[in-house]
């Protein structure tokens, strides 16, 4: 067992996603059975008592890999020396709130967290943002952490990616492990574009295997894009366990690398690839190695895909303009 634990900070740690996520992290789902983990858990003051209860449960699991837990409400204390920060906590949209209100409320949270990460996180920090609106929250945190390389920030579109794989497997009768090269483009919102035109089912082009453009356009894409709303409708609460699982998947692949011959979807800072304006945090197909990601290049984008990428990118640009006007970036 490696001597030095990975210091993992989790925000919103007493929330629904946090509750599912912490036990995955502590059990070794992130880096396997040989690397201990130290959890550093951030919550707002009113939730600290509930978080103490979660820590009691973590203690009761006697996880061999869990080397320590620290909790608190001060990001400068909790992020101190963190190697990985998973920003799960965010202000949910309440009754009567406009989207601009949501952006402003979360802006304050992610501004403070970005500044704290900039001051006290470890030199090798990687920051994954799960709390919504994830792409723009990541942009705000990144903009407030000028000393951390911009490539170290990513927003979660892995849940959408996993949802897309599951739907394609169901349609084709394949196993999820048979499906490679799935891509989510754009925003983690209803405008996202799940793209199967470069995906493969057992090495064959997925769109050709499906052979049904109507299903792709009118069933697959809206099912993936609106899956979160469907889960709320069915269970009366938002998807938490699946979001925690995707958060773990995304962090693991970022740190340990993607398999040969495959890629994953991550929302990362655009360099202008595929016509996505530079500086937006948008989902792309990426490969990862040694903690760094690279956008997959050279994919052909047809008119059908182009219009959908442009639509979700326009929404991201609108969100960036809104938080710029609010003075958050």
UniProtKB/Swiss-Prot annotation:
One of its GO terms (biological process) is tricarboxylic acid cycle. Keywords: NAD, Oxidoreductase, Tricarboxylic acid cycle. Disulfide bonds: none annotated. Its EC number is 1.1.1.37. The active site is at residue 188. CDD domains: MDH_chloroplast-like (cd01338). The keyword Oxidoreductase applies. Substrate binds at residues 93, 99, 132, 163. InterPro entries: L-lactate/malate_DH (IPR001557), Lactate/malate_DH_C (IPR022383), Lactate/malate_DH_N (IPR001236), Lactate_DH/Glyco_Ohase_4_C (IPR015955), Malate_DH_AS (IPR001252), Malate_DH_type2 (IPR010945), NAD(P)-bd_dom_sf (IPR036291). It is an enzyme of class 1 (oxidoreductase). It catalyses: (S)-malate + NAD(+) = oxaloacetate + NADH + H(+). NAD(+) binds at residues 12-18, 106, 113, 130-132. GO terms for molecular function: L-malate dehydrogenase (NAD+) activity. NCBIfam families: MalateDH-SF1, PRK05442.1. HAMAP family: Malate_dehydrog_2. Catalyzes the reversible oxidation of malate to oxaloacetate. Belongs to the LDH/MDH superfamily. MDH type 2 family. This is Malate dehydrogenase. It comes from Mycobacterium avium (strain 104). The gene is mdh.
